[in-house]
Amino acid sequence: MVTNRVDVFWHEGMLRHDAVEGVFDTGYDPGFLDVLEKHPENADRVRNMLSILRRGPIAPHVNWFTGLPAIVSELLMFHTSEYIEKLVEADKSGERCEIAAGTFMSPGSWEAALLAAGTTLSAMQHILDCHGKIAYALVRPPGHHSQPTQADGYCFLNNAALAVKLALNSGSCSRVAVIDIDVHYGNGTAEGFYTSDKVLTVSLHMNHGSWGSSHPQKGSIDELGEDVGLGYNLNVPLPNGTGDRGYEYAMNELVVPAVRRFGPDMVVLVVGQDSSAFDPNGRQSLTMNGYRRIGQIMRGVAEEHSHGRLLMVQEGGYHVTYAAYCLHAMLEGVLKIPEPHLSDPIAYYPEEEANAVAAVESIKTYHTEFVPFLRGT
């Protein structure tokens, strides 16, 4: 008998976003290549995530729900009206345009973005209304790079941040912890809550730094928040090549203690499978087992602090097949499924965690000195 289930929120309209072809994510055709590649954030990656949840071994543990599109008033919980107007006007033009580096809006993109935001809001509302405790918003385009005033990194609207705002505005949540395991810094979410002590944002990412005007944040350990939010933005830049043991060490030594000190009543896990060993858009070495352990740890965090309430929001993950396998493994961990139902098809990358452990210990020392609410841990 299945007693442990995840409520998955999805809408087919999100497949209509077409992020162009070219050289990787540039949309550029140099004229001398016979075969161009799809943009890494293409619909195929999400189709496989969808199908593995529908037809894979985990399918009996999944309840399906259809998300609703967000409306403008909901978007204004996080984004400025000027920015939303810019997106609306770009959509009205009916032409393909590059909103930010590598971030293309085409006919159908705005509809998909509204569905991604609204589907995530639907999932959070589902939890707030006590219809379920564990929900996963399977959405695209992704959102965690989108800032209140601008697009960035394939992201138009910050889906997870909007869900956090909804939770805080509901009256039933006063403190939300957001844990981001995408391989890239969740700069948009961090930016939106940078002066808040109601939201703890923790981002585990490769140490990539800033990548231009749309992404001025570095994701470094000294970006701690400002004013009353000082100390509530914790960055964990991990060395390239960090794998399962390194991520588990960071989760247990940095993330879990910080969340325990913060004491949230809602937990949001921002998920990217681009931290896997084979992702074209990252340089880390997580395998299915690593994602499974993260799922187990996050389930424990939710049970300890938020009465088991856990919202998961999909972000990156660009290996068209392996990202789906990693999602399956993570949800197995969240659902406490005792043994893996799928063997890992390609995980053979050797891991040396010494560099990751050294980085985590250095970050821990920094936090105890400069983060007020973590002093004494």
From Swiss-Prot:
Keyword Hydrolase tagged: yes
Enzyme Commission no: 3.5.1.98
CC cofactor note: Binds 1 zinc ion per subunit.
GO molecular function: histone deacetylase activity, hydrolytic mechanism; zinc ion binding
Protein name: Histone deacetylase 8
Localization per Swiss-Prot or TrEMBL: Nucleus; Cytoplasm
Main location: nucleus
Cofactor(s) annotated in UniProt: Zn(2+)
Primary gene name: HDA8
GO biological process: chromatin organization
Classification via SUPFAM superfamilies: Arginase/deacetylase
Residues annotated as the enzyme's active site: H145 (proton donor/acceptor)
One Pfam family hit: Hist_deacetyl
